[in-house]
């Protein structure tokens, strides 16, 4: 009914630009999956385009792993409008095709979705997210059994399968017996694994009072990042309260890209108020980080991705030299 109403509105509009844009082609399933504006039409993110992508992936999984036991997948999603609906529809379609589904109970960071695929021994997984794109967008990322995005030869083979699917082929009626809800059980294992990556826990102990301002920009980072920082030993973590609220409308930012100064404005404002040492922000699916710190004049400046990477690399090399692991 919702789709019919939207199409009817476009048909009745004398200006057919929107109608043409929504239907003039199929939303392309590429090597990274799907990404596009949400709405009715073959060139939009909706239950039918998401359904076709899931049906195509299910068909390919059943071809690849036929006679190899129960096939399973992980399904995750971010905070975006319709992400949960798309995730539940995808879970139904996978299960209707005989595939066991581990569906996260709520939004989770993309890295945890990748981890869960390996931890649970799944053959594939998907995450419903459009990363840091504006609120009108949503997306569909596909992963293989190693937790990484699908690579050759599977990527093009999946694309071929998706392109064969018609609306009539999509099995929307799920099998609830094959859908298992996951959440805190996987969170704990994931955070335990993340904490083993600490290069020198003693450094954290010495810097436990480091004043950190964090914002998830309304996204999935809110579920794990604050608790992870505290479990690691940082005792002075301050979250931007208005941006800890889950919302696909991203009401406090123009665009939820943590590398944009505008998106960090509220976090920097809080940092100035409490005299923090560093600002951290994550995008809606928490696989991209933006950072800011004070320069030698005490002014807050953004650290871009390249600079952040260099700082990490410098610290790793410095630590390995100090511990005799590198010359």
Label every model-predicted segment.
Residues 49-56, 112, 189-193, 263-266, ...:
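Well-ordered alpha-helical segments embedded in enzymatic catalytic cores
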Residues 12-16, 39, 43, 55, ...:
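Generic secondary-structure signature for well-ordered alpha-helical cores
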Residues 105, 165-186, 295-327:
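Proline/glycine-rich low-complexity loops and linkers
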Residues 1-90, 180-209, 220:
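An N-terminal, well-structured beta->alpha segment
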Residues 89-97, 120, 141-149, 227-235, ...:
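A glycine- and small-aliphatic-rich helix-loop capping segment at beta-alpha/alpha-beta transitions
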Residues 126, 138-159, 289-318:
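Glycine-rich phosphate-binding loop of actin/hexokinase-like ATP-binding domains
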Residues 74-137, 235-291:
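N-terminal small/polar loop signature for handling phosphorylated ligands or for N-terminal nucleophile
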Residues 18-22, 26-27, 138-263:
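Gly/Ser/Thr-enriched, mixed-charge loops and adjacent short helices
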């Amino acid at each position: 009914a919702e789709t019919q109403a939207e199409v009817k509105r476009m048909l009745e509009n004398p200006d057919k630009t929107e109608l043409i844009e929504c239907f003039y082609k199929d939303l392309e399933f590429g090597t990274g999956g799907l990404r596009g504006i949400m709405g009715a039409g073959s060139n939009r993110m909706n239950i039918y385009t998401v359904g076709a992508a899931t049906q195509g992936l299910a068909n390919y999984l059943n071809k690849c792993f036929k006679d190899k036991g129960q096939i399973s997948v992980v399904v995750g999603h971010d905070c975006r409008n319709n992400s949960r609906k798309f995730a539940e529809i995808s879970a139904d379609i996978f299960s209707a095709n005989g595939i066991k589904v581990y569906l996260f109970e709520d939004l989770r960071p993309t890295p945890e979705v990748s981890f869960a695929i390996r931890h649970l021994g799944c053959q594939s997984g998907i995450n419903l997210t459009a990363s840091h794109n504006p609120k009108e967008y949503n997306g569909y990322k596909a992963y293989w059994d190693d937790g990484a995005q699908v690579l050759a030869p599977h990527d093009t083979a999946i694309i071929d399968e998706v392109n064969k699917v018609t609306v009539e082929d999509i099995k929307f009626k799920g099998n609830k017996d094959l859908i298992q809800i996951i959440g805190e059980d996987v969170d704990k294992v994931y955070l335990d694994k993340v904490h083993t990556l600490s290069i020198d826990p003693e450094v954290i102990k010495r810097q436990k009072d480091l004043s950190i301002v964090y914002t998830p920009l309304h996204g999935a980072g809110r579920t794990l990042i604050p608790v992870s920082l505290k479990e690691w030993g940082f005792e002075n973590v301050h979250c931007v309260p208005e941006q800890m609220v889950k919302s696909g409308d991203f009401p406090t930012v123009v665009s939820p890209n943590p590398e944009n100064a505008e998106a960090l404005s509220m976090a920097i404002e809080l940092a100035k108020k409490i005299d923090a040492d560093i600002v951290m922000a994550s995008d809606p699916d928490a696989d991209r980080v933006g950072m800011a710190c004070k320069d030698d004049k005490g002014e807050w400046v953004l650290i871009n991705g390249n600079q952040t990477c260099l700082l990490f690399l410098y610290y790793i090399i410095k630590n390995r030299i100090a511990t005799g692991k590198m010359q």
